[in-house]
């Protein structure tokens, strides 16, 4: 009887350890754009599987998926349909604020990249956003809620005062980056300006007459995180060893992107089935203002602004409030 009871205890303990230290499948989601190269590298070179195995977690399976926007992706995370997601900083800020102090609390894993976003125009009369007329239309991925729409609000607040942050909202229209690029380059139609993402913003600038009137780094007062990865405290707490492997995989992937941009560009082309030539993609991800880094940069600017306009209830006291401790030793902001 005593041996039977001891055996049951051992089995229960083993099951408890297994549930807290590993996961048979990790579901990772990202969005379209060139902001997630670490994930492309991790998928192709099986880095998470490698680091998990080195820590004793064998046969970990990774399921990769792509979402069209942050809302659906965040809903999938909250409903436990995915484990790890990546997108723009406002998506993280929104979900962090919504889940703070709850059982479903969400925080950032790390930044992925700092890249400038360009507001490009084809209209001769537009030299800056101050020249936008009621007849102009600015294409953004999603009005009012996308990274680009929020950047335009921040720029308006800087130029016209905080109370007028929504001055240009009525001029914005929702349009995917590919469709917005076609609309801009056609030279006709109501869209005169586009706030987009790489590589579309670079493609737009290849056409004579198209020029940049706003750089997001100017709005953010310096280099700013473009893409970031986040997850739930539930997933991190349940899988501490796997989470350690994830951080190691992200570090290795970031190093690979830094050292071999052409390799990373090739992975991205393959994953999105892009027809862009390798040298052009490599040039975009190697731009003078592009940095592949896990360090969050100027994320507090987004949070403070979103709190000031009521998008979230209150801003975090520090960027560290929005990120798990594994990156707290970085010189973030």
What are these regions (language model features)?
Residues 1-9:
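Bacterial N-terminal signal peptides that target proteins for export
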Residues 236-313:
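Secondary-structure end/capping motifs
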Residues 17-23:
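Sec/Tat signal peptide C-region and signal peptidase I cleavage site
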Residues 37, 113-119, 210-211, 225-229, ...:
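Small-molecule pocket liners
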Residues 161, 167-169, 178-270:
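Pocket-lining segment of extracytoplasmic ligand-binding domains
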Residues 25-165, 170-174, 188, 192-198, ...:
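Short, glycine-/small- and polar/acidic-enriched structural segments
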Residues 306-333:
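Conserved C-terminal helix/tail region of periplasmic/extracytoplasmic solute-binding proteins
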Residues 10-11, 21:
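Cleavable N-terminal signal peptides
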